[in-house]
């Protein structure tokens, strides 16, 4: 049975705008992602928009000054965005525009087999070994923090650290930090929610400019 693309936009409790594209399951892989990005490009109040990438790989909207972060899995594409910040160079890290998003299927059991590779000993103690949901939240948190920090090649176990996990059943956030190349500890807030059988996690710094006051 053929399905249509579904476009959904909302603002999270931490003030990050989210755009989700799902559906059209008769297509898959890179072709699905390409069509989903086309749907994103066409759904804007300000006209057609194009996702491009800096040399670092970080995404941006051509001709716009809003930080974005992009992730996809299966039949879901997620684009997170912040308010316009024309005073900030989006090609490099700035705490005002620190943003990362990651999405993963809520049933992906493979994360249980590789948790030792990306979780520190302290993190392994707070993430139950047999809890798929907790491990997916931990994995998406690490990925979102990596995207927010804009530090290529950073070690996930030693320099991206989770203090606690967000709660999917409430608006409860969690805390984490990233150690930059100068040894500075950058504090982050994590927020996770579930949509269409997927877990989405956002990471922003304590100084990130958002669309509204955080709860």
Question: Whereabouts are the PLM-identified features?
Answer:
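Core catalytic alpha/beta fold that binds nucleotide/phospho-ligands
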Residues: 1-215
């Amino acid at each position: 049975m053929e399905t249509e693309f579904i476009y959904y936009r909302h603002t999270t409790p931490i003030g990050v705008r989210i755009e989700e594209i799902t559906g059209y399951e008769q297509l898959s892989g890179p072709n699905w992602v390409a069509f989903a990005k086309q749907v994103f490009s066409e759904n804007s109040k300000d006209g057609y928009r194009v996702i491009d990438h800096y040399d670092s790989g970080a995404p941006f909207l051509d001709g716009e000054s809003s930080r974005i972060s992009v992730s996809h899995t299966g039949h879901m594409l997620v684009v997170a965005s912040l308010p316009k910040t024309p005073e900030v160079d989006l090609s490099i890290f700035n705490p005002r525009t620190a943003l990362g998003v990651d999405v993963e299927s809520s049933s992906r059991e493979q994360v249980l087999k590789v948790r030792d590779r990306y979780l520190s000993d302290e993190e392994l103690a707070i993430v139950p070994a047999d809890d798929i949901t907790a491990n997916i939240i931990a994995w998406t948190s690490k990925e979102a923090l990596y995207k927010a920090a804009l530090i290529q090649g950073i070690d996930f176990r030693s320099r991206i650290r989770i203090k606690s996990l967000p709660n999917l059943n409430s608006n409860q956030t969690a805390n984490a930090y990233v150690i930059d190349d100068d040894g500075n500890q950058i504090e982050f807030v994590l927020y996770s929610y579930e949509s269409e059988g997927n877990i989405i996690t956002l990471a922003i710094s304590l100084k990130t400019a958002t669309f509204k006051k955080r709860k």
